[in-house]
Amino acid sequence: MSESKSSRQATLRYQMELFLLAVSFFSRLPVPSDLPYSEERMNQAGRYFALVGVILGVLCALVFYFTQLIFPDSVAIVLTMAFSLLLTGAFHEDGLTDMADGIGGGMTVERRLSIMKDSRIGTYGAATLVMALLAKFVLWSELVHLPDFWLVIVVAYTTSRALAATLIYDMPYVSDSDTSKSKPLASKQSSSEVAILLFTAGVASLFLGVIQTSFIVIVLFAFRFAFKRWLTKRIGGFTGDCLGAAQQLSELLVYLTLIAFYQNI
């Protein structure tokens, strides 16, 4: 009996450590400095990426709630967006920028991958980043008057990270695994890990409503199919930057989908 209890405690502790690894990878939130790390653990932590999205979404929703008590909605939106960038270290935005530079500026697969590794921002990346941030501001401005706007943020942050993480499941990793920060994530996911991602995203979305969730699922599945085919054609697989781009683009698609839904009911 005691052995069984000890085994359960060890399992729970291990899963908590995986979750904290996911938090440390995707955010600037503090985690214990003695947290065990290995590439295998980091790869397994991918199952909790959507749950990290829940945490980040809730924190951003709280910032918006308190700032809009003091400032106009537009100012509260800008402050919340700034907080989100600080919270994540602009991790996903950086991926979107690098992917845009690489695929936009490279004429061959090798050149595209080489440009993605360059830390400098080019024309394609700068334009894409500006458009993405502007789009987020405009879309939030359209949704801000919904009584459950805070929940929209949580759902978008959660589902977009789930979608990005699932690309690891059925796409080859094509970056230089010796130098890439995303190397630990490059291994294939198990079906159970994908199921955890989808379950987390599904539960969060259902709080918006079954119909809204259905529309979001349809749109994101269509996007994933198209984005996967596009990446395969352009670079033959995915890189860490592509995962960041997938998160950013799918987050914007969630907002667009909900605007279209509420506009036509």
Swiss-Prot record:
GO biological process: cobalamin biosynthetic process
GO terms, molecular function: adenosylcobinamide-GDP ribazoletransferase activity; cobalamin 5'-phosphate synthase activity
EC number(s) recorded for this UniProt protein: 2.7.8.26
InterPro entries assigned: CobS
Record flagged with keyword Oxidoreductase: no
Keyword terms: Cell inner membrane, Cell membrane, Cobalamin biosynthesis, Magnesium, Membrane, Transferase, Transmembrane, Transmembrane helix
Membrane topology annotation: Multi-pass membrane protein
Keyword match Protein biosynthesis: no
Location(s), subcellular: Cell inner membrane
Pathway in which the depicted protein is active: Cofactor biosynthesis; adenosylcobalamin biosynthesis; adenosylcobalamin from cob(II)yrinate a,c-diamide: step 7/7
Co-factor(s): Mg(2+)
Enzyme class: transferase
A Pfam entry, by short name: CobS
GO cellular component, one term: plasma membrane
Main location: membrane
Spans traversing the lipid bilayer: 51-71, 72-92, 121-140, 203-223
Catalytic activity: alpha-ribazole + adenosylcob(III)inamide-GDP = adenosylcob(III)alamin + GMP + H(+); alpha-ribazole 5'-phosphate + adenosylcob(III)inamide-GDP = adenosylcob(III)alamin 5'-phosphate + GMP + H(+)
Top-level division of the source organism's lineage: Bacteria
HAMAP family hit by this protein: CobS
Record function comment: Joins adenosylcobinamide-GDP and alpha-ribazole to generate adenosylcobalamin (Ado-cobalamin). Also synthesizes adenosylcobalamin 5'-phosphate from adenosylcobinamide-GDP and alpha-ribazole 5'-phosphate.
Family per similarity comment: Belongs to the CobS family.
NCBIfam families membership: cobS, PRK00235.1-3
Protein name, per record: Adenosylcobinamide-GDP ribazoletransferase
Originating species: Vibrio parahaemolyticus serotype O3:K6 (strain RIMD 2210633)
Top-level taxonomy: Bacteria, Pseudomonadati, Pseudomonadota, Gammaproteobacteria, Vibrionales
Gene: cobS
